Amino acid sequence: MKVAVIGAAGGIGQALALLLKNGLPAGSDLALYDIAPVTPGVAADLSHIPTPVSIKGYGGVDPTPALEGADVVLISAGVARKPGMDRSDLFNVNAGIIKSLAEKIAVVCPKACVGIITNPVNTTVAIAADVLKKAGVYDKRRLFGITTLDIIRSETFVAELKGKTPSDIQVPVIGGHSGVTILPLLSQVEGVEFSDEEIKALTPRIQNAGTEVVEAKAGGGSATLSMGQAAYRFGLSLVRALQGEQGIVECAYVEGDGKHARFFAQPVLLGKDGVEEVIDYGKLSTFEQEALNNMLDTLTSDITLGEEFAAK
């Protein structure tokens, strides 16, 4: 099993690479790529950690050696948010990066499962999908927007609020991966009851948690370490499912049945081909249904922006 981390010299990429070096199944190959020349050094550094995972790093303009033979590609390449920016402000730079990487993936490893971390995810996933489609290699089961950060934040904040162990809390999060499009289904958290006031306070806190970190870092970056952990959780789940483990469910932003929008985040059952089944998210509370209805215009316009960029 070969996993490639693209954007591996950045804050998210380095954190993700460290976790994968420690946590991938024995015998896995880990390839790191970044345009930054430091990348082989990041791999050399990580190679000293005594785990049965081989690691190589590649810098420069061509990601081909990292992508060759990859089963899973995790993309965190791009610029990070700074104070005063929202995820859509990243579009102008990051859209071009995702487009060129998707063009390369289409040629080098068209069968790989691709997880996109690069923001704005609502838009970058649509770009990747249409670039792969144009190349005739798109398989919607193998392309994911990684929204796991919204899930781990939800689990953490709920556990803190209710005095529970975070690992005992499961919060499905649907919609997209920015602002109002992030919808935690707090009504579905087992063993926990929320007042209306708690839901009205917790929902925007989860939606705006990224901004909380950007502001706390005071211009020094965005959520890199927690995002690295989130991408690791999703990436490892995907690897385990590809290797035949049954019953692995994660929320992810995928192309489903188009009921709400072409791409939508919801629970998915992972399998040997990527998405085995998109799972119905169940009954929503009145608050959640209203929030869903109110986000769809934003989500749809985010997706359209990506489709239009890919068509250029």
Swiss-Prot record:
InterPro entries: L-lactate/malate_DH, Lactate/malate_DH_C, Lactate/malate_DH_N, Lactate_DH/Glyco_Ohase_4_C, Malate_DH_AS, Malate_DH_type1, Malate_DH_type1_bac, NAD(P)-bd_dom_sf
GO molecular function, one term: L-malate dehydrogenase (NAD+) activity
Active site: H177
Pfam family, one: Ldh_1_N
One biological process term in Gene Ontology: tricarboxylic acid cycle
Binding positions for substrate per the UniProt entry: R81, R87, N119, R153
Disulfide bonds: none
Catalysis performed (reactions): (S)-malate + NAD(+) = oxaloacetate + NADH + H(+)
HAMAP family in the record: Malate_dehydrog_1 (MF_01516)
Protein name in UniProt: Malate dehydrogenase
Organism: Photobacterium profundum (strain SS9)
Taxonomic lineage from the root: Bacteria, Pseudomonadati, Pseudomonadota, Gammaproteobacteria, Vibrionales
